[in-house]
Amino acid sequence: MTQMETQETLSARFLAQQDIQLNLIEKDSKNLKDHIDYWESMRKEQVLAFYAKKENMSRLGLQPLPPAKVSEQKAKDAIRIQLLLQSLYKSDFGSEPWTLSECSLEMLNAPPRNCFKKQPFTVTVQFDNDPKNVYPYICYEYIYYQDDRDKWHKVKGLVDHNGLYFKEVTGDSVYFKLFQPDATVYGKSGQWTVIFKNKTIHSSVTSSSRSAFGPADEQPGPSTSYDKSQQERSGSGQPKALQDTEPPTSTSTVRLRRGRREREHHSYRHRKSQSELGADSAPTPEEVGRRSHTVAAHGLSRLRRLQEEARDPPVLIITGQQNNLKCWRYRFSQKYADLYECCSSAWKWLGPKSEGYRGDAKLLIAFKNPEQRLSFLNTVGLPKNTTYSMGHLDSL
C-alpha cells in the first residue's frame, strides 16, 4: 500500500476483487487453477479490508468493514488454502476435477483437518443401540493428505465400530473421529450401532464398563451393494487413533492372556532346567536387557525375579505432538536403524483420566540393552517440545 491510497481507490480495488470472485463462482469450474485464482482474490480482498480498517475507514463502497482482526484471520486462511491448492495442483491429483466447494475453508477444516475430501457419505450411529438416539457423522469416499515430505496421497475414507479413519500409504491408520467419547455423553450403556452404506455394525459389548474398542458383529443391510474391499481394508491391520493404536478386542485379549500364560509356563520350565544345571545366577552384562519373553509369574524368589527381570528389554517413551513424533520417527528410522530394536507407531492413552485424542501422542522405542539406549539418546536429537521416560518391558 502507498500513502496515495484514498477511500475511493481502495473501494474500487475492493469491488474489483469481489467481481473476480463472483465470475469464478458463476463459472462453476472444475479446474483447480480457477480455485487457486479464487483464493488469491479472497486474500487480496481481505488485505484491502484490513488496511482500510487500520486507516480508520468504516466501509469500502457500500460494504461495512469488520474488525481488523477478522480481516487478518480471513487473509491468513486464504493464504493457507492457496498454498495447499498450489501444492495439490503440482501433484498427481492436480488434473482431477475439483469443485469450488471441495476447496472451501469449511471442507478443509472439517475432520480430518488440513486434508481435501471428496464424495461425502453419512454414517449413522445409534447410541445404546436405540434407533431414536442417533447422530449422523460425515465420512468421505476419498481423502487427500500430505505425508511427512509434503507429498500428496489419495486414500479411501473408512469406517469401523470404533470410528472414522483413513489408512496412510505407510500402513498406519489414522482416526479422525471416535464414537466412544460421544457414547459416554449421549448414551448410558457404552454400546452403539454403526450404520452406513446399507451395512450395519452391531456392538457385542455386554457391559458398560467395556472398552470403546470392544468387538463388533458386522451384518449386511438389506442391500448387497456394499463394497467388500472396503470392509476388508477397514478390518485389516491395527488402526491407530489420531490415536494411533487399537487395543485388542475381548476375543484377542483372551487369546493374548492364554498365550501369555503358556509362555510363562514354558519359560519357567526352561529356566528351571537351567537352574538344575547350575545356571541360577545373576545375568552377565551382555545378558542385561536381552530378554524378549515374560518372566514367570510364580515359583521365583525375590532375588531370582530381580535377576531375571534385569534381562528385560529397556525402552524409551517419547511424549509430544503427534505430527512431530511421526516426522521424527521417519527421520531416525532412515538414518539410525542400528541404534534401536523396534519402534511403535504414534499412540495415545484413552480412558477417563486421559485427554484422549486431544492429548499428546507417544512413541515407544525398544533397545537391546541400556548401552544401546544411551547411545541412541546421545546420538539422535529429540524434537522440540518433547519429553522422554525410561523403562523396561517384560516382553515385546
UniProtKB/Swiss-Prot annotation:
Cellular compartments per GO CC: host cell nucleus
Chain spans, region Disordered: 206-292
Residue segments, region DNA-binding domain: 312-396
PTM text: Phosphorylated.
Gene3D superfamilies (alphabetical): 3.30.70.330, E2 (early) protein, N terminal domain, subdomain 1, Papillomavirus E2 early protein domain
Family note: Belongs to the papillomaviridae E2 protein family.
Subunit structure: Binds DNA as homodimer. Interacts with protein E1; this interaction greatly increases E1 DNA-binding activity. Interacts with protein L1; this interaction enhances E2-dependent replication and transcription activation. Interacts with protein L2; this interaction inhibits E2 transcriptional activity but not DNA replication function E2. Interacts with protein E7; this interaction inhibits E7 oncogenic activity. Interacts with host TAF1; this interaction modulates E2-dependent transcriptional regulation. Interacts with host BRD4; this interaction mediates E2 transcriptional activation function.
Protein name: Regulatory protein E2
Lineage, broadest ranks: Viruses, Monodnaviria, Shotokuvirae, Cossaviricota, Papovaviricetes
